[in-house]
UniProtKB/Swiss-Prot annotation:
Effect upon mutating C122Y: Deficient in both cleavage and recognition by RPS2 plant cells. Fails to elicit RPS2-dependent defense response. Localized to the chloroplast
InterPro entries: Peptidase_C70_AvrRpt2 (IPR022118)
Gene (UniProt): avrRpt2
Region (Determinants of cleavage specificity) location: 70-71
Organism: Pseudomonas syringae pv. tomato
Effect of H208A: Abolishes the normal in planta processing, RIN4 degradation and fails to elicit RPS2-dependent defense response
Post-translational modification note: Autocleaved inside plant cells upon activation by cyclophilin. Cleavage is crucial in subcellular location and in eliciting HR. Inhibited by cyclosporin A (cyclophilin inhibitor).
Effect ascribed to mutating D226A: Produces an unstable protein and fails to elicit RPS2-dependent defense response
GO biological process: proteolysis; symbiont-mediated perturbation of host programmed cell death; symbiont-mediated perturbation of host transcription
Start-end of Low complexity biased regions: 86-98
Subunit structure: Interacts physically with plant cell ROC1 (Arabidopsis single-domain cyclophilin) and RIN4.
Protein's UniProt name: Cysteine protease avirulence protein AvrRpt2
Keyword Cell membrane attached: no
Active site feature: C122, H208, D226
Keyword Secreted: yes
């Protein structure tokens, strides 16, 4: 039997791309471009400064603080606060700022703890606020100062202060020789160390402890939790500098 040869056409395939494939190609190009942009953003966010700026723009809004009259008690920024436990989301925001913005720094993860009816309990309430901002668990404090039913005694002796610092794992802030902090200096301390306990003289001329949580250059003020008066209070920076307990080396403490 003879098999007839079959002719095969070897004409080259057309290189023309069907018109309906164009949107797919464009979509792939866009996806590749977006992926490249994402990689670039991830790369550019590798520095602490860029991460701080991204955190600020995504977490913080612009907070306006009304500066109170000199010598008066301080205005609350928010009525929402916790009364003992630590925050579930330890979310901190850091210094904002390009050349056209006013720097704002505020730690939002610091729980508020009141001293309640304890007349001399500000130091222990502050220890709880700072401690619970970084870890759960009981605070050591100074149990020996809790005697009787009237609450704790104050931190009167340097030996008490030293034991308090040791028990709570606190560190002193190096105070400037000129006895004056700028917004930038306080913002850098908060960014590096978190909330800071500070001792100061109140408008009633009594020594007291509170917790520094933020600064706002636009209103020339600081933000702080006060165990007696409430959370998220504002104080003029000049007032803070005048009233800080500069005469003692433990005027400012952090974890």
């Amino acid at each position: 039997m003879k098999i007839a040869p079959v002719a095969i056409n070897h004409s080259p395939l057309s290189r023309e791309v069907p018109s309906h494939a164009a949107p797919t190609q464009a979509k792939q190009t866009n996806l590749q471009s977006e992926a490249g942009d994402l990689d670039a953003r991830k790369s550019s966010a590798s520095s602490p400064e860029t991460r701080a700026l991204l955190a600020t723009k995504t977490v913080l809004g612009r907070h306006k603080i009304e500066v109170p009259a000199f010598g008066g008690w301080f205005k609350k920024k928010s009525s929402k606060h916790e009364t003992g436990g630590s925050s579930a989301n330890a979310d901190s925001s850091s210094v904002a700022s390009d050349s056209t913005e006013k720097p704002l720094f505020r730690l939002t993860h610091v729980p508020y703890v009141s001293q309640g009816n304890e007349r001399m309990g500000c130091w222990y309430a502050c220890a709880r606020m700072v401690g619970h901002s970084v870890e759960a668990g009981p605070r050591l404090g100074l149990p020996e100062l809790y005697e009787g039913r009237e609450g704790p005694a104050g931190l009167q002796d340097f030996s008490d202060v030293e034991r308090f610092i040791h028990n709570e794992g606190l560190t002193r802030v190096d105070l400037p020789d000129n006895e004056r902090f700028t917004h930038e200096e306080l913002g850098a301390l908060l960014y590096k160390h978190g909330p800071i306990i500070f001792g100061w003289k109140t408008p009633n001329d009594s020594w007291h402890m509170s917790v520094l949580t933020g600064v706002d250059k636009e209103t020339s003020s600081i933000t702080f939790h006060d165990p007696r008066q409430g959370p998220d209070l504002a104080m003029p920076l000049d007032y803070f500098n005048q009233r800080l307990a500069w005469q003692v080396p433990h005027a400012m403490l952090y974890r």
